């Protein structure tokens, strides 16, 4: 009975396993046949924890393999709670990269810089040195203490549209200065500035006036609206580890941003950013 008994036991265990639903399926981005706008944040792919001023990569989990000659659009947004008394979010556009003539390796990682004919990078005036896009569309973010929230993305590959988000929780660190971070910068922007007006055009779905902020109903931006992205940049590619990242030249040189970050972040953290020598 030796082996036959073991086989019966294995079959029985397999039946129980399948009846219970089998292995947990990985959470993947939602695929849509149309372009947003959204009326609410997309479903989150999970919750991630990071220490303030520490780096973390938020992936899109989109499979780029199998097609070619199409346009690729990758956009990321940051949604921060408006106040402690509501679950409403105020959305800030971060990065938008549009690449044309893209071909996707069947068995290799997709990289915008090498797999596409040409591309254009759009950034919001609210963007700063605390985040950047990697070559495959993931978001590398170095959040400040106040930068907990939802980080949502939109990816378009030809006629296919993918949406998803990550819930980022930020742990306090005594080494991370309070005046560093994305939310701090957004809150300090002058409401009367021309760039701020462009970024919060009435069609963009952002917080464009005091009345809307009082109602605490900032909506997810209509990502197809060009006014959401007020700057067009030439993109500089650099390498950090095994990944390429894109740096918007209109925000100044990467070295200048590192030097600016150094005034807000501890020396302990300084070396973890891509260095200027990697910018060629």
From Swiss-Prot:
This is Glycoprotein G. The PsHV-1 glycoprotein G does not seem to possess a transmembrane like the other family members. Residues 1-24 form the signal peptide. The gene is gG. Disulfide bonds: none annotated. It comes from Psittacid herpesvirus 1 (isolate Amazon parrot/-/97-0001/1997). It comes from the Viruses. Residues 191-218 are annotated as: Disordered. Belongs to the alphaherpesvirinae glycoprotein G family. The lineage of its organism: Viruses, Duplodnaviria, Heunggongvirae, Peploviricota, Herviviricetes. Keywords: Glycoprotein, Signal. Glycans are attached at residues 85, 111. InterPro entries: Ig-like_dom_sf (IPR036179). The keyword Transcription regulation does not apply.
